A protein has these predicted regions:
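Alpha-helical scaffold elements adjacent to nucleotide-binding pockets in ATP/GTP-utilizing enzyme cores
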Residues: 47, 51, 84, 123-127, ...
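Short beta-strand elements
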Residues: 18-24, 277, 380-383
Length: 506
């Protein structure tokens, strides 16, 4: 007999539908799986047989062939266990074939027949259309976020068999709540002093401008960066689904609702490999940190300590908002629309106090050159962060709260969307004159900086985008960008070099 059962596998951060075709025929008992299964799928033969027998069902004493169609593309993971087990029982005559119509099955089987959750249920459920989806109870909430059809959670293979045979109704339990992964957001009011850096955070959030914080150890660069997440608006439905699917595919914890709605914040260690940061791997296409930060903040602390090859791998994703990964038999595109924030010391020794740098010119040049010019050029904001003064540290008066600043950020983003349909960092040079025209005095200021070799052509475009955001943050629609907006944007393009040189426009 023959049976075809719907299921899905994970491919990068996307689900791919798979038809599990099972043929049971006379012959010496055997159990073969074909259709490019990987090692975890081949191992399912033993898991499935033990789970079926532990559930009280009879195992066919015939030749069993399982084909995973379509045969192109390697099938990975243990999520096909449940579909294979149901397919064997249908093809063997234990379950009527009519009972599995318009049903799809995802889940790993334990040897005792228990159903275990697998990573990537959200994108796999999204790939199965409007089919009713049978999943482990631990994956039900995640599946319901994206599934178009009804979700039927189960805890044991026996429950699924009894429901399909009509002996008992579907259990239809309430899904288990997911582990809490949405940690509280640190408040901006906790930052003492740092008026320029606080202003830079607000501008970065309002215009989605990449930002580099330059300062000595203990200046508060990490503290500032962690407050940026709270200034960003909640993700829209489309981006929230994309972020949820990426987190699900990577096996990362999801918030209790099952949907990633708050902008993610990822801070990988500087020893991270290219595969960890960008994504990929030798045997799978696992999302990297830049995809896990999709819709939020990717924070690279001690950015100059990352391997230059790893940093250069960020250039294409930052430009396109997606990561393209190619392997010999695999190709995937992962979402990677992030706000990049880097933090670094001004020199290898840290340069804590003015005139205290002990680094020679050669050491300083090597340190600075670890960040390539093309990557450095992608930072619209380069801000010097000094250690706060004693009076600022001892001041009992809190600064503006995250809620107050986030309201201004949201209003500025609304202005940009109404004007040009996107954030200001996405303005192409051809549209700057239309959407970010300069008043005459602002144009003279920019001209002066260019003539004195303090601003390049590409830097000029970035200054105009930042100035457009600063103008929007005034809270009132402004047709032109004022001189004061350009002056503030120029202040936020610090050079990288000796501490004494920081502050020059570049």
């Amino acid at each position: 007999m023959f049976a075809s059962i719907s299921s899905a596998v994970l491919f990068g951060a996307e689900g791919q539908p798979v038809n599990v075709e099972v043929h049971v025929d006379k012959g010496l008992p055997a159990f073969n799986v074909v259709g490019l299964p990987d090692e975890s799928v081949r191992e399912s033969r033993d898991r499935v047989r033990a789970a079926v027998m532990s559930s009280g069902a009879s195992w066919p004493r015939h030749r069993i062939t399982v084909n995973l169609a379509p045969s192109r593309g390697r099938k990975t993971g243990s999520g096909l266990d449940l579909a294979i087990a149901i397919g064997v029982l249908v093809a063997g005559g234990s379950i009527p074939i009519e009972s599995v119509r318009n049903l799809a099955f995802i889940g790993e089987l334990g040897l005792d027949g228990s159903l275990r959750p697998v990573p990537g249920v959200a994108p796999m459920a999204g790939a199965l259309g409007d089919a009713e989806l049978v999943v482990p109870i631990g994956s039900a909430l995640e599946a319901r976020v994206v599934a178009l059809g009804r979700t039927r959670p189960a805890a044991h293979l026996r429950e699924v068999i009894e429901a399909l045979m009509g002996d008992l109704p579907w259990p239809d339990r309430e899904p288990e709540p997911l582990p809490v992964a949405d940690e509280p957001v640190s408040d901006l009011s906790e930052v003492r002093g740092q008026p320029l850096a606080r202003r830079a955070l607000e501008i970065a959030a309002a215009g989605a401008h990449h930002m580099l914080l330059i300062g000595p150890p203990g200046a508060g660069k990490t503290m500032l960066a962690t407050r940026l997440r709270g200034l960003l608006p909640l993700l829209g439905r489309k981006q929230a689904l994309e972020a949820t699917m990426v987190h699900s595919a990577a096996g990362a914890p999801l918030p209790p609702s099952g949907l990633v709605q708050r902008a993610p914040f990822r801070a990988p260690h500087h020893s991270s490999s290219a595969a960890a940061l960008i994504g990929g791997g030798s045997h799978s296409l696992r999302p990297g940190e830049i995809s896990l930060a999709h819709g939020g903040v990717l924070f690279l602390d001690e950015i100059a300590e990352f391997a230059p090859k790893v940093l250069n791998g960020l250039r294409q994703p930052l430009e396109d908002g997606t990561v393209r990964i190619d392997r010999s038999r695999m190709h995937a595109e992962l979402p990677a629309n992030v706000l990049l924030v880097g933090a670094m010391n001004p020199c290898p020794c840290g340069g804590g106090a003015p005139g205290a740098c002990q680094c020679g010119d050669a050491a300083l040049n090597r340190y600075v050159q670890r960040i390539s010019g093309p990557l450095l050029d992608r930072f619209d904001l380069r801000v010097n962060v000094n250690r706060p003064a004693v009076d600022d540290l001892l001041d009992d008066q809190p600064g503006e709260s995250t809620a107050v600043v986030a309201a201004r950020v949201a209003a500025a983003r609304d202005l940009a969307w109404m004007r040009q349909g996107g954030v200001n960092s996405e303005l192409v040079p051809a549209h700057l004159e239309q959407f970010a025209p300069l008043e005459s005095s602002a144009r003279l200021l920019v001209r002066h900086e260019i003539e004195h070799d303090r601003l390049s052509g590409r830097g000029y475009h970035r200054v105009r985008r930042v100035a457009r955001t600063i103008a929007d943050l005034r809270g009132e629609p402004s047709e032109v960008v004022l001189e004061q907006d350009v002056a503030m944007a120029l202040r936020m393009r610090a050079s990288i070099g000796r501490p004494s040189a920081i502050g020059r426009v570049a």
